Amino acid sequence: VAGKRMQMAAIEQFMESIGEQDHQTQFNDLSVRLDTLDVTVLRVLATVANGESPGNESSILKIMATELAQDITELGMVVRQYAGIASFSAEMPDRAGAKAMVDYLGTRSQSIYGGSNEIQKNIIAKRALGL
């Protein structure tokens, strides 16, 4: 969650630096989803600390975290494209654009490793819903 918060802070800083407001609603939505993920992680940790099994929550967390990571990195790319700034542009000497591209491409695989999101959804359907 901490890494996702750092990505969100970088996106927010970039959006402010270019005066970008068109994607503010999407940014706010991601912020709420990140807070929700944080609370869910804490709830699961409390369950484990009490000696209980997390059950379906581990599958739910995997889906929430990977989809959120993908959406955060996608927003990072969208606002950079919106500003017309290329990955290795002189406007971004710290290579933040290149890092955004690496993060974006890297998160695509997160929905596969650890069990694809589709498999995780099937696990939840079978265990929680009895389907």
Which functions belong to the PLM regions below?
Residues 1-131:
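Alpha-helical interface subdomain recognition
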